[in-house]
C-alpha cells in the first residue's frame, strides 16, 4: 500500500474499531493504479475476517449496473429510450394516476402519456418510494412491492401483477421517484433479452469484465451478516444463510445484487473507458437526464446539486471536496457507496454490512480523508 492513502485506511479502521460496523472493504483507483483495504470480521463474535474479495449485498449500487445493461441493449438496437415500456411490460399499459399523491386509490385520472423505457431509466415513470403514510404507500407495503433492502419475495410476473393493480402517484415523465422504476427495468431487461436476467447480465457485463464475484446470491460461507442499527446496537437484517444465500425468485438490479469491491471497481473502470459501452450511451447514462420539474423529487431526497442519468446520480455542482460537476455514483441502503470523479481522476468504492439509518446518512468518514489525500 502507498503512503498516500494511509490516512484513509486509518479512518476506516477507526470506524470499525468504534463498533459502528463489524467490518468493511474499500478500494481507491487513482493515477492508473488501484489499492484495496479490508478490515474487521464478517459476523460479530466470529473469527471469519473480511477479505478484499468478500461478497456484499450492494443494494442500490445495482442500479448503475442496470443502467449499463440497458445502455448496452440500446447500443445494439434491442431497446430504444422512447419505446413504450408496455411492449415488454403489458401490465403497464393504460395506467391510471392519482389526482393527488395523497388521494384515495380510487380517485384517479388516465395517464397523459405512455410510460417509456426512458422513464424507467430515469426513475420518472410515476411511482416509487413514498416517505409519507398515504393510501398508495400503505397499499404498496401491503402488496409487498414497496422499496426495501430485501428484494421482493415473489416472481417478476407476480410483482408486475400486484403493481399493475395500483395507480401511479404522478403523471409519467413529470417527477423523479425512487427505486420502483429500477425493479420494473429489471423485469423489462429480462423480457427484452428473452432470458433470465442473470444470463443477460453475464453475457453483457459481468462475463466480459471478469466479475466472477457478482450475481444475485453468494456462498453463505463467504457472505457477511447484514446488520441494521437498533436501539440496543446492531441487529441482524439478513444472516449469511438468509435471503442472499440462494437463487431468488425475483432477480432485481434495483436492490438484489451481490458483488465484491474489486468487481465493482472493474465495472466503474470499464464504464470510464470504452470497454463496456459506446461513447454515446455512456454519455447519456452518466450525464444529467432530468428537467427542473422532474428533479424536484430527487432534491427532496438528496438535496440540491445532484441530478440523475440512467440509473445513477450525477453531480451538477461540486458541493463537497471530493465531488465535481460531471462526477457520478450512488449509495446502497445496505451500507455501500461508490463515486467516479473524472475531472480529479479517481474512483472510490466502499462496502460495509451496516444498513444506512436513512437517506441523509452519509459516508463522509471515507470521502473526506480521500479528498484530503488527493
Q: Over which residues does each language-model region extend?
A:
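Acidic helix-start/capping segments at beta-turn-to-alpha-helix junctions
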Residues: 86-95
